[in-house]
Curated annotation (Swiss-Prot):
Residue numbers covered by motif 'HIGH' region: 9-19
Catalytic activity: tRNA(Glu) + L-glutamate + ATP = L-glutamyl-tRNA(Glu) + AMP + diphosphate
Name of this chain's protein: Glutamate--tRNA ligase
Source organism of the structure: Buchnera aphidicola subsp. Acyrthosiphon pisum (strain APS) (Acyrthosiphon pisum symbiotic bacterium)
GO function terms (MF aspect): ATP binding; glutamate-tRNA ligase activity; tRNA binding; zinc ion binding
Length: 467
Protein backbone atom coordinates (compact mmCIF):
# COMPACT_ATOMS: atom_id res chain seq x y z
CA UNK A 1 0.00 0.00 0.00
CA UNK A 2 1.39 3.39 -1.05
CA UNK A 3 1.05 5.74 1.92
CA UNK A 4 -0.73 9.01 1.20
CA UNK A 5 -1.48 11.63 3.84
CA UNK A 6 -3.07 15.05 3.65
CA UNK A 7 -3.08 18.38 5.42
CA UNK A 8 -6.49 19.96 4.97
CA UNK A 9 -6.80 23.29 6.80
CA UNK A 10 -9.80 25.59 6.51
CA UNK A 11 -8.75 29.20 5.78
CA UNK A 12 -10.83 30.73 8.55
CA UNK A 13 -8.11 31.94 10.90
CA UNK A 14 -4.42 31.84 11.74
CA UNK A 15 -2.21 28.91 10.83
CA UNK A 16 -0.99 28.14 14.35
CA UNK A 17 1.22 25.64 16.16
CA UNK A 18 -1.59 23.07 16.42
CA UNK A 19 -2.21 23.20 12.66
CA UNK A 20 1.49 22.95 11.91
CA UNK A 21 1.85 19.94 14.21
CA UNK A 22 -0.86 18.18 12.19
CA UNK A 23 0.90 19.13 8.96
CA UNK A 24 4.31 18.07 10.31
CA UNK A 25 3.14 14.68 11.58
CA UNK A 26 1.31 14.00 8.29
CA UNK A 27 4.34 15.12 6.27
CA UNK A 28 6.79 13.06 8.34
CA UNK A 29 4.63 9.94 8.16
CA UNK A 30 4.46 10.22 4.37
CA UNK A 31 8.20 10.86 4.08
CA UNK A 32 9.05 7.99 6.47
CA UNK A 33 7.12 5.57 4.24
CA UNK A 34 8.25 7.12 0.92
CA UNK A 35 4.66 8.14 0.36
CA UNK A 36 2.94 11.33 -0.77
CA UNK A 37 1.74 14.39 1.12
CA UNK A 38 -1.30 16.27 -0.20
CA UNK A 39 -2.30 19.87 0.54
CA UNK A 40 -6.03 20.55 0.44
CA UNK A 41 -7.79 23.81 1.29
CA UNK A 42 -11.23 23.19 2.82
CA UNK A 43 -12.83 26.51 1.87
CA UNK A 44 -16.54 25.68 1.58
CA UNK A 45 -17.31 27.98 4.52
CA UNK A 46 -17.73 30.99 2.24
CA UNK A 47 -18.60 33.35 5.08
CA UNK A 48 -15.47 32.79 7.17
CA UNK A 49 -12.89 31.78 4.55
CA UNK A 50 -10.30 34.49 3.93
CA UNK A 51 -7.66 34.95 1.22
CA UNK A 52 -5.23 36.23 3.85
CA UNK A 53 -5.56 32.91 5.70
CA UNK A 54 -4.82 30.99 2.49
CA UNK A 55 -1.65 33.05 2.02
CA UNK A 56 -0.76 32.33 5.65
CA UNK A 57 -1.06 28.58 5.01
CA UNK A 58 1.13 28.64 1.90
CA UNK A 59 3.76 30.97 3.38
CA UNK A 60 3.94 29.07 6.66
CA UNK A 61 4.40 25.66 5.04
CA UNK A 62 6.99 26.98 2.57
CA UNK A 63 8.99 28.71 5.31
CA UNK A 64 9.09 25.49 7.34
CA UNK A 65 10.03 23.40 4.31
CA UNK A 66 6.91 21.20 4.46
CA UNK A 67 6.64 20.78 0.70
CA UNK A 68 3.59 19.05 -0.73
CA UNK A 69 3.52 16.47 -3.54
CA UNK A 70 -0.02 17.17 -4.73
CA UNK A 71 -2.22 20.22 -4.61
CA UNK A 72 -3.12 22.63 -3.39
CA UNK A 73 -6.65 21.44 -4.05
CA UNK A 74 -9.52 23.82 -3.26
CA UNK A 75 -12.89 22.38 -2.32
CA UNK A 76 -14.70 25.33 -3.93
CA UNK A 77 -13.23 24.20 -7.28
CA UNK A 78 -14.63 20.69 -6.84
CA UNK A 79 -18.32 21.54 -6.39
CA UNK A 80 -19.37 19.71 -9.57
CA UNK A 81 -17.70 16.55 -8.28
CA UNK A 82 -19.54 16.75 -4.95
CA UNK A 83 -22.84 17.25 -6.80
CA UNK A 84 -22.08 14.22 -8.96
CA UNK A 85 -21.55 11.99 -5.91
CA UNK A 86 -24.67 13.36 -4.19
CA UNK A 87 -26.75 12.50 -7.27
CA UNK A 88 -25.37 8.94 -7.22
CA UNK A 89 -26.28 8.64 -3.53
CA UNK A 90 -29.80 9.95 -4.22
CA UNK A 91 -30.25 7.40 -7.00
CA UNK A 92 -29.06 4.59 -4.70
CA UNK A 93 -31.30 5.97 -1.93
CA UNK A 94 -28.30 6.40 0.36
CA UNK A 95 -29.35 10.06 0.61
CA UNK A 96 -32.67 11.86 0.52
CA UNK A 97 -34.26 15.28 0.13
CA UNK A 98 -35.44 16.90 3.36
CA UNK A 99 -37.95 19.77 3.25
CA UNK A 100 -38.27 20.32 7.00
CA UNK A 101 -38.10 24.04 7.73
CA UNK A 102 -35.70 25.60 10.22
CA UNK A 103 -38.67 26.54 12.38
CA UNK A 104 -39.93 22.94 12.45
CA UNK A 105 -36.50 21.60 13.33
CA UNK A 106 -36.06 24.17 16.10
CA UNK A 107 -39.43 23.19 17.64
CA UNK A 108 -38.42 19.52 17.57
CA UNK A 109 -35.04 20.39 19.08
CA UNK A 110 -36.61 22.32 21.97
CA UNK A 111 -38.99 19.47 22.80
CA UNK A 112 -36.14 16.94 22.78
CA UNK A 113 -34.10 19.08 25.16
CA UNK A 114 -37.11 19.59 27.46
CA UNK A 115 -37.45 15.81 27.70
CA UNK A 116 -33.75 15.46 28.47
CA UNK A 117 -32.99 13.82 25.14
CA UNK A 118 -30.03 14.50 22.86
CA UNK A 119 -31.15 16.82 20.00
CA UNK A 120 -31.21 14.94 16.69
CA UNK A 121 -33.11 14.86 13.44
CA UNK A 122 -36.10 12.49 13.83
CA UNK A 123 -36.05 11.24 10.23
CA UNK A 124 -39.27 12.97 9.16
CA UNK A 125 -38.41 12.97 5.45
CA UNK A 126 -36.27 9.82 5.46
CA UNK A 127 -38.75 7.52 3.76
CA UNK A 128 -40.92 10.02 1.87
CA UNK A 129 -38.95 9.60 -1.36
CA UNK A 130 -39.43 13.26 -2.25
CA UNK A 131 -38.65 13.96 -5.91
CA UNK A 132 -40.56 17.01 -7.13
CA UNK A 133 -39.53 19.94 -4.97
CA UNK A 134 -39.79 22.82 -7.52
CA UNK A 135 -38.33 25.91 -5.79
CA UNK A 136 -39.01 24.75 -2.26
CA UNK A 137 -36.11 25.19 0.19
CA UNK A 138 -34.56 21.87 1.00
CA UNK A 139 -31.40 20.14 2.14
CA UNK A 140 -30.04 16.73 1.28
CA UNK A 141 -29.33 14.29 4.09
CA UNK A 142 -27.29 11.11 4.26
CA UNK A 143 -29.35 8.07 5.23
CA UNK A 144 -27.30 6.94 8.22
CA UNK A 145 -27.72 3.28 9.30
CA UNK A 146 -30.30 3.00 12.08
CA UNK A 147 -28.75 0.02 13.81
CA UNK A 148 -25.36 -1.46 14.58
CA UNK A 149 -22.11 0.15 15.58
CA UNK A 150 -19.27 2.01 13.90
CA UNK A 151 -15.87 0.75 15.00
CA UNK A 152 -12.45 1.96 13.99
CA UNK A 153 -8.94 1.34 15.28
CA UNK A 154 -7.39 4.70 16.05
CA UNK A 155 -3.60 4.49 15.75
CA UNK A 156 -3.17 6.62 18.88
CA UNK A 157 -6.22 5.78 21.01
CA UNK A 158 -7.00 2.18 20.13
CA UNK A 159 -10.50 0.98 19.28
CA UNK A 160 -13.24 3.63 19.27
CA UNK A 161 -16.90 2.60 19.01
CA UNK A 162 -20.02 4.64 18.22
CA UNK A 163 -23.62 3.45 18.23
CA UNK A 164 -25.45 4.29 14.99
CA UNK A 165 -28.54 5.05 17.05
CA UNK A 166 -26.65 8.09 18.40
CA UNK A 167 -25.92 9.44 14.92
CA UNK A 168 -28.63 11.31 13.06
CA UNK A 169 -29.02 11.77 9.31
CA UNK A 170 -26.26 14.21 8.46
CA UNK A 171 -26.95 17.13 6.10
CA UNK A 172 -24.60 16.70 3.14
CA UNK A 173 -25.93 19.59 1.05
CA UNK A 174 -27.23 22.86 2.47
CA UNK A 175 -30.31 24.71 1.26
CA UNK A 176 -28.05 27.08 -0.72
CA UNK A 177 -26.69 24.14 -2.70
CA UNK A 178 -23.29 24.04 -0.99
CA UNK A 179 -22.01 20.65 0.20
CA UNK A 180 -21.10 20.35 3.88
CA UNK A 181 -17.71 19.79 5.46
CA UNK A 182 -18.17 16.15 6.48
CA UNK A 183 -19.34 15.18 3.01
CA UNK A 184 -16.60 17.04 1.09
CA UNK A 185 -13.93 15.46 3.28
CA UNK A 186 -15.18 11.98 2.42
CA UNK A 187 -15.26 12.61 -1.34
CA UNK A 188 -11.83 14.25 -1.26
CA UNK A 189 -10.23 11.45 0.74
CA UNK A 190 -11.83 8.94 -1.63
CA UNK A 191 -10.75 10.69 -4.85
CA UNK A 192 -7.26 11.52 -3.60
CA UNK A 193 -6.76 7.96 -2.32
CA UNK A 194 -5.77 9.11 1.17
CA UNK A 195 -4.57 6.12 3.21
CA UNK A 196 -3.89 7.77 6.59
CA UNK A 197 -5.79 10.66 8.18
CA UNK A 198 -3.83 12.38 10.96
CA UNK A 199 -5.83 15.17 12.60
CA UNK A 200 -6.95 16.69 15.90
CA UNK A 201 -9.09 14.89 18.46
CA UNK A 202 -11.91 17.39 17.85
CA UNK A 203 -12.61 15.36 14.68
CA UNK A 204 -13.25 12.08 16.50
CA UNK A 205 -17.00 12.74 16.56
CA UNK A 206 -16.96 13.33 12.77
CA UNK A 207 -15.22 10.04 12.06
CA UNK A 208 -18.20 7.60 12.42
CA UNK A 209 -20.31 9.79 10.12
CA UNK A 210 -17.52 9.89 7.55
CA UNK A 211 -16.95 6.13 7.81
CA UNK A 212 -20.66 5.46 7.21
CA UNK A 213 -20.62 7.64 4.08
CA UNK A 214 -17.45 5.90 2.85
CA UNK A 215 -19.10 2.52 3.43
CA UNK A 216 -22.14 3.60 1.42
CA UNK A 217 -19.77 4.52 -1.42
CA UNK A 218 -18.04 1.11 -1.10
CA UNK A 219 -14.65 2.75 -0.51
CA UNK A 220 -11.79 1.48 1.64
CA UNK A 221 -11.66 3.24 5.01
CA UNK A 222 -8.41 5.15 5.70
CA UNK A 223 -6.41 4.66 8.88
CA UNK A 224 -7.20 7.34 11.49
CA UNK A 225 -4.93 8.89 14.09
CA UNK A 226 -6.40 11.63 16.29
CA UNK A 227 -3.94 13.95 18.03
CA UNK A 228 -4.61 15.33 21.50
CA UNK A 229 -5.07 19.06 21.81
CA UNK A 230 -2.33 21.61 22.43
CA UNK A 231 -2.88 24.03 25.32
CA UNK A 232 -1.46 27.52 25.72
CA UNK A 233 0.63 28.43 28.76
CA UNK A 234 -2.56 29.24 30.71
CA UNK A 235 -3.99 25.79 30.04
CA UNK A 236 -6.53 26.95 27.43
CA UNK A 237 -7.07 25.11 24.17
CA UNK A 238 -5.38 26.91 21.28
CA UNK A 239 -8.01 28.22 18.89
CA UNK A 240 -7.18 29.76 15.53
CA UNK A 241 -9.75 32.50 15.98
CA UNK A 242 -8.96 33.37 19.62
CA UNK A 243 -5.54 32.83 21.17
CA UNK A 244 -3.44 31.42 18.35
CA UNK A 245 -0.22 33.01 17.13
CA UNK A 246 0.08 33.00 13.35
CA UNK A 247 3.00 30.75 12.44
CA UNK A 248 4.52 33.57 10.35
CA UNK A 249 4.84 35.62 13.54
CA UNK A 250 7.49 33.14 14.66
CA UNK A 251 9.46 34.12 11.58
CA UNK A 252 8.86 37.79 12.37
CA UNK A 253 10.19 37.17 15.88
CA UNK A 254 13.39 35.62 14.56
CA UNK A 255 12.92 31.88 14.99
CA UNK A 256 14.70 29.41 12.73
CA UNK A 257 12.38 26.95 10.93
CA UNK A 258 14.42 23.93 12.10
CA UNK A 259 14.10 25.03 15.73
CA UNK A 260 10.34 25.48 15.44
CA UNK A 261 9.87 22.08 13.78
CA UNK A 262 12.04 20.41 16.43
CA UNK A 263 9.98 22.09 19.14
CA UNK A 264 6.65 21.19 17.55
CA UNK A 265 7.47 17.52 16.95
CA UNK A 266 8.01 17.15 20.71
CA UNK A 267 4.49 18.44 21.45
CA UNK A 268 3.04 14.96 21.72
CA UNK A 269 5.75 12.72 20.29
CA UNK A 270 8.96 11.44 21.83
CA UNK A 271 11.89 9.15 21.15
CA UNK A 272 13.34 8.22 24.52
CA UNK A 273 14.96 11.21 26.20
CA UNK A 274 16.24 12.70 22.96
CA UNK A 275 15.45 16.42 22.60
CA UNK A 276 17.23 17.53 19.44
CA UNK A 277 16.22 16.11 16.05
CA UNK A 278 17.38 17.29 12.66
CA UNK A 279 14.99 16.83 9.76
CA UNK A 280 16.61 13.59 8.59
CA UNK A 281 16.26 12.11 12.07
CA UNK A 282 12.63 13.21 12.26
CA UNK A 283 11.83 11.43 8.99
CA UNK A 284 13.70 8.30 10.04
CA UNK A 285 12.38 7.99 13.60
CA UNK A 286 8.82 9.34 13.44
CA UNK A 287 6.00 6.86 14.03
CA UNK A 288 2.40 7.01 15.19
CA UNK A 289 2.90 4.55 18.07
CA UNK A 290 4.99 7.02 20.07
CA UNK A 291 2.38 9.79 20.03
CA UNK A 292 0.89 10.43 23.46
CA UNK A 293 -2.83 10.53 24.25
CA UNK A 294 -2.28 13.36 26.73
CA UNK A 295 -2.58 17.05 25.93
CA UNK A 296 0.60 19.05 25.35
CA UNK A 297 1.28 22.53 26.69
CA UNK A 298 3.16 25.26 24.87
CA UNK A 299 6.25 26.42 26.77
CA UNK A 300 7.67 29.57 25.22
CA UNK A 301 10.86 29.44 27.32
CA UNK A 302 11.55 25.96 25.95
CA UNK A 303 11.05 27.24 22.42
CA UNK A 304 13.50 30.10 23.06
CA UNK A 305 16.02 27.60 24.44
CA UNK A 306 15.56 25.42 21.36
CA UNK A 307 16.02 28.36 19.01
CA UNK A 308 19.19 29.49 20.79
CA UNK A 309 20.53 25.95 20.46
CA UNK A 310 19.98 26.00 16.71
CA UNK A 311 21.45 29.49 16.30
CA UNK A 312 24.59 28.34 18.13
CA UNK A 313 24.91 24.88 16.60
CA UNK A 314 23.81 25.31 12.99
CA UNK A 315 26.49 25.98 10.34
CA UNK A 316 27.77 29.55 10.49
CA UNK A 317 27.05 30.28 6.84
CA UNK A 318 23.45 29.04 7.20
CA UNK A 319 22.71 31.20 10.26
CA UNK A 320 24.37 34.15 8.50
CA UNK A 321 22.13 33.66 5.45
CA UNK A 322 19.06 33.48 7.69
CA UNK A 323 20.16 36.67 9.46
CA UNK A 324 20.79 38.40 6.12
CA UNK A 325 17.28 37.55 4.88
CA UNK A 326 15.77 38.61 8.19
CA UNK A 327 17.62 41.94 8.27
CA UNK A 328 16.72 42.72 4.68
CA UNK A 329 13.05 42.11 5.52
CA UNK A 330 13.52 44.75 8.23
CA UNK A 331 14.88 47.17 5.60
CA UNK A 332 18.45 47.03 6.89
CA UNK A 333 21.08 47.39 4.16
CA UNK A 334 23.57 44.67 5.07
CA UNK A 335 26.09 46.09 2.59
CA UNK A 336 26.61 49.08 4.91
CA UNK A 337 28.15 47.07 7.72
CA UNK A 338 30.59 44.29 8.55
CA UNK A 339 30.51 40.73 7.27
CA UNK A 340 27.50 38.97 8.79
CA UNK A 341 29.45 35.84 9.67
CA UNK A 342 31.63 37.96 11.97
CA UNK A 343 28.51 39.35 13.65
CA UNK A 344 26.95 35.91 14.07
CA UNK A 345 30.15 34.70 15.74
CA UNK A 346 30.10 37.74 18.00
CA UNK A 347 26.43 37.75 18.98
CA UNK A 348 24.91 34.28 18.72
CA UNK A 349 25.95 33.07 22.15
CA UNK A 350 24.28 36.14 23.69
CA UNK A 351 20.83 35.89 22.10
CA UNK A 352 17.88 33.55 21.53
CA UNK A 353 16.50 34.85 18.22
CA UNK A 354 17.49 36.54 14.97
CA UNK A 355 15.34 39.45 16.07
CA UNK A 356 17.43 39.93 19.21
CA UNK A 357 20.64 39.73 17.19
CA UNK A 358 19.30 42.24 14.67
CA UNK A 359 18.26 44.72 17.35
CA UNK A 360 21.63 44.32 19.08
CA UNK A 361 23.68 45.06 15.99
CA UNK A 362 21.65 47.73 14.21
CA UNK A 363 24.31 50.30 15.11
CA UNK A 364 26.70 48.62 12.67
CA UNK A 365 24.34 49.53 9.82
CA UNK A 366 22.44 52.60 11.00
CA UNK A 367 23.54 55.92 12.43
CA UNK A 368 22.77 56.69 16.07
CA UNK A 369 20.29 59.55 16.28
CA UNK A 370 19.03 59.13 19.81
CA UNK A 371 20.49 58.79 23.30
CA UNK A 372 18.58 57.67 26.36
CA UNK A 373 17.93 60.48 28.87
CA UNK A 374 19.55 58.46 31.67
CA UNK A 375 22.65 57.93 29.53
CA UNK A 376 22.90 61.66 28.85
CA UNK A 377 22.58 62.59 32.51
CA UNK A 378 25.07 60.01 33.76
CA UNK A 379 27.69 59.81 31.04
CA UNK A 380 27.64 62.99 28.95
CA UNK A 381 30.09 64.88 31.17
CA UNK A 382 33.07 67.15 30.54
CA UNK A 383 35.37 64.42 31.82
CA UNK A 384 34.02 61.93 29.29
CA UNK A 385 34.20 64.56 26.57
CA UNK A 386 37.93 64.86 27.28
CA UNK A 387 38.31 61.06 27.25
CA UNK A 388 36.68 60.90 23.82
CA UNK A 389 38.82 63.71 22.44
CA UNK A 390 41.95 61.90 23.60
CA UNK A 391 40.76 58.61 22.08
CA UNK A 392 39.92 60.39 18.83
CA UNK A 393 43.49 61.63 18.42
CA UNK A 394 44.93 58.17 19.11
CA UNK A 395 42.51 56.37 16.76
CA UNK A 396 43.04 58.92 14.01
CA UNK A 397 46.78 58.16 13.99
CA UNK A 398 46.32 54.38 14.07
CA UNK A 399 47.85 52.81 10.94
CA UNK A 400 47.23 49.11 11.59
CA UNK A 401 43.49 48.56 12.16
CA UNK A 402 43.14 45.47 14.34
CA UNK A 403 41.74 44.43 17.70
CA UNK A 404 45.12 44.39 19.39
CA UNK A 405 45.96 48.00 18.49
CA UNK A 406 42.49 49.28 19.40
CA UNK A 407 42.77 47.61 22.82
CA UNK A 408 46.22 49.18 23.21
CA UNK A 409 44.74 52.64 22.63
CA UNK A 410 42.33 52.11 25.54
CA UNK A 411 45.24 51.03 27.75
CA UNK A 412 47.40 53.97 26.63
CA UNK A 413 44.65 56.54 27.23
CA UNK A 414 44.00 55.06 30.66
CA UNK A 415 47.64 55.54 31.63
CA UNK A 416 47.94 58.92 29.95
CA UNK A 417 44.99 60.70 31.60
CA UNK A 418 44.73 58.52 34.73
CA UNK A 419 41.21 57.12 34.27
CA UNK A 420 40.12 53.51 34.42
CA UNK A 421 39.78 51.38 31.30
CA UNK A 422 36.20 50.69 32.40
CA UNK A 423 35.33 54.41 32.18
CA UNK A 424 36.97 54.72 28.77
CA UNK A 425 35.25 51.60 27.45
CA UNK A 426 31.84 52.78 28.66
CA UNK A 427 31.85 56.18 26.94
CA UNK A 428 33.31 54.62 23.79
CA UNK A 429 30.58 51.96 23.91
CA UNK A 430 27.88 54.62 24.19
CA UNK A 431 29.44 56.57 21.33
CA UNK A 432 29.63 53.51 19.08
CA UNK A 433 26.33 51.79 19.94
CA UNK A 434 24.11 54.27 21.75
CA UNK A 435 23.81 51.76 24.59
CA UNK A 436 25.68 50.73 27.74
CA UNK A 437 25.83 47.04 26.75
CA UNK A 438 27.70 45.45 23.85
CA UNK A 439 30.35 42.85 23.12
CA UNK A 440 34.01 43.79 23.62
CA UNK A 441 34.30 47.47 22.71
CA UNK A 442 37.56 46.96 20.85
CA UNK A 443 35.84 44.36 18.65
CA UNK A 444 32.86 46.67 18.09
CA UNK A 445 35.15 49.54 17.04
CA UNK A 446 37.09 47.19 14.77
CA UNK A 447 33.92 46.07 12.96
CA UNK A 448 32.44 49.57 12.74
CA UNK A 449 35.57 50.76 10.96
CA UNK A 450 37.93 53.67 11.49
CA UNK A 451 36.06 56.34 9.55
CA UNK A 452 32.68 55.62 11.12
CA UNK A 453 34.21 55.24 14.61
CA UNK A 454 35.84 58.68 14.40
CA UNK A 455 32.61 60.22 13.13
CA UNK A 456 30.61 58.80 16.04
CA UNK A 457 33.16 59.94 18.63
CA UNK A 458 33.05 63.42 17.13
CA UNK A 459 29.24 63.45 17.17
CA UNK A 460 29.13 62.67 20.90
CA UNK A 461 31.84 65.24 21.67
CA UNK A 462 29.78 67.90 19.90
CA UNK A 463 26.61 66.68 21.62
CA UNK A 464 28.24 67.08 25.05
CA UNK A 465 29.63 70.50 24.18
CA UNK A 466 26.17 71.71 23.21
CA UNK A 467 24.48 70.56 26.42
Amino acid sequence: MKVKTRFAPSPTGNLHIGSIRTALYSWLFARHHNGKFVLRIEDTDLVRSELISIDSIFNGLKWLGLNWDEGPYFQTKRLDRYKEVINVMLEKEDAYICVCSCQELEEIRKKQIEKGNKPRYPGTCRNLNIKNISNQNHVIRFKNPLFGKVKFQDKIRGEIVFDNAELDDLVIQRSNGMPTYNFCVVVDDMDMKITHVIRGEDHISNTPRQINILNSLKVKIPVYAHLSMILDEKGNKISKRKNAINIIEYYENGFLPEALLNYIIRLGWSYGDKEIFNLSEMKELFNLKSITKSSSTVNFKKLLWMNKYYINNSPLDYVSDCLKNYMEKKNINVEKGPDLELLVKLFRSRHHTLKEITESCRYFYEEINFFNHTVIEKYFTRKNCFILQTCYKKIEKLSIWDNKNISKIINDVSELIKVTKKEISMILRISMTGDICSPSISTVILLIGKEKALLRINNVVNYIKNL
